[in-house]
A protein has these predicted regions:
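Nucleic-acid processing machinery
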Residues: 1-237
């Protein structure tokens, strides 16, 4: 029964959280399910991540300080944090890309938060002018957001000491949405940033609620939810 629930969570509830932009909840649901469906793999990845964190703390601090210095010298005030991948996201990439755990976890990840969209692109230009960019790793989700309205700039560079560095650049508001998804809109309900037009993007969610309230069998809800979730897109992470 536990395995059945874990599979259901992985197939329905985690993707549903993703579709609503609730990345933090999605990650928690995936991790809980992963701990049931493949506990040995999860433990292996967690041990690898712990090893990397313990042995690269000084490197993280040095690189973060250098990036901050570069931005501040050009009038951009930002906060930079390390970005840790979740065990399941690492496992999924290992399976999809057929690469080793060591190859994937050797990459250092940072999240750069700035005050406005203009600074996002300025920061990107500074990073690319200072460090070699890795071809094929640039994605602009600000000009072209994901279907769940996620916005951010992703790029990868060869940083100091020849480290491969993945960088996400976004505003504070974009970061809040990336974590809380549709719920972050409620914060702006009484402000100019919020409008009824925002909710038209989530008409599919209203349909889903109606299906649940009709009291159909769990099997009907399960199948309908899958159809509603994936009828337009195939999600890549």
């Amino acid at each position: 029964k536990i395995i059945k629930k874990a599979k259901e969570t992985m197939e329905i509830y985690a993707p549903l959280a993703d579709r609503m932009g609730m990345n933090r909840i999605r990650d928690e649901l995936e991790d809980l399910s992963f701990s049931v469906l493949n506990k040995p793999a999860r433990e292996l990845i967690l041990n690898r991540l712990k090893f990397i964190k313990n042995n690269n703390e000084d490197t993280f601090k040095t690189i973060a300080a250098e990036l901050i210095k570069l931005l501040e010298a050009n009038g951009i005030f930002a906060s930079i944090t390390g970005r840790e991948k979740t065990p399941f996201s690492i496992w999924r990439k290992i399976q999809n890309k057929k690469i080793s755990l060591e190859q994937l976890t050797d990459i250092i990840g940072f999240r750069v938060l700035v005050n406005n969209v203009e600074d996002c692109y300025k920061a990107l230009g500074l990073f690319h002018s200072k460090f070699p960019a890795i071809p094929g790793k640039f994605k602009d989700y600000i000009s072209t957001p994901k279907i769940n309205k996620y916005k951010s700039i992703h790029t990868s560079i060869i940083g100091p000491k020849k480290n491969r560095i993945e960088i996400q650049i976004r505003t504070h508001e974009m970061n809040e949405f990336a974590q809380r998804g549709i719920a972050s809109h409620w914060k702006y309900k009484s402000s100019e940033k919020f409008s009824d037009l925002s909710w038209k993007e989530y008409d599919w969610l209203r349909d889903l609620v109606e299906i649940i309230e009709t009291g159909n069998s769990p099997e009907h809800y399960y199948e309908f939810t899958k159809l509603q979730m994936f009828q337009e897109n195939v999600f890549c992470f």
